[in-house]
A protein has these predicted regions:
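Mature catalytic domains of secreted/periplasmic carbohydrate-active enzymes
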Residues: 1-150
Length: 150
């Protein structure tokens, strides 16, 4: 359910989660557990959902992007064995900084034009985690790669 919510926000939409009460007015145990788990995750990571929108970045197999002001959020559902998350940024966009929402700074390496690797920490995450990217986007980017002239 959480992945569906994140997917909807990453595409510029929203999602309504509807739990219908039983005849006695109570909710099913499974529904209560789902709502509690979503609420717990949102308390820690809601910054990547609330007031966020479509980022316009190429989707990667590890998860989704959302966007708010000068930040892009990486919501990681599939942690790669390589411990490297590939991030392909739009033209003239640079990643300035990457931090987990708990404040831990991440190592970012530019690997090619418009492509970075973000090193995943050694922590054992039991649920999807979020990395906040501070970005700079301008026509006068200091990118060291140049367009090929043909």
């Amino acid at each position: 359910m959480l992945e569906r919510i994140v997917h909807a926000v990453s595409m510029g939409g929203n999602m309504v989660v509807n739990f219908g009460p039983q005849a006695d007015g109570d909710f099913r145990t499974e529904e209560k557990e789902i709502a509690k788990a979503i609420g717990k995750w949102m308390q820690k990571n809601g910054e990547c959902i609330y007031a966020c929108d479509y980022a316009g970045w190429e989707k990667q197999a590890w998860g989704y992007y959302t966007h708010k002001k000068n930040s892009v959020y990486m919501i990681v559902f599939n942690r790669p064995y390589s411990k490297q998350l590939t991030v392909k940024v739009p033209k003239e966009t640079q990643i300035i900084n990457a931090i987990l929402l708990n404040g831990e700074k991440m190592k970012v390496t530019e690997t090619a034009r418009n492509e970075y690797n973000v090193r995943v920490p050694k922590q054992d995450f039991q649920e999807p985690f979020v990395i906040k990217l501070e970005i700079k986007s301008s026509k006068t980017s200091t990118n060291k790669y140049y367009e090929a002239l043909t």
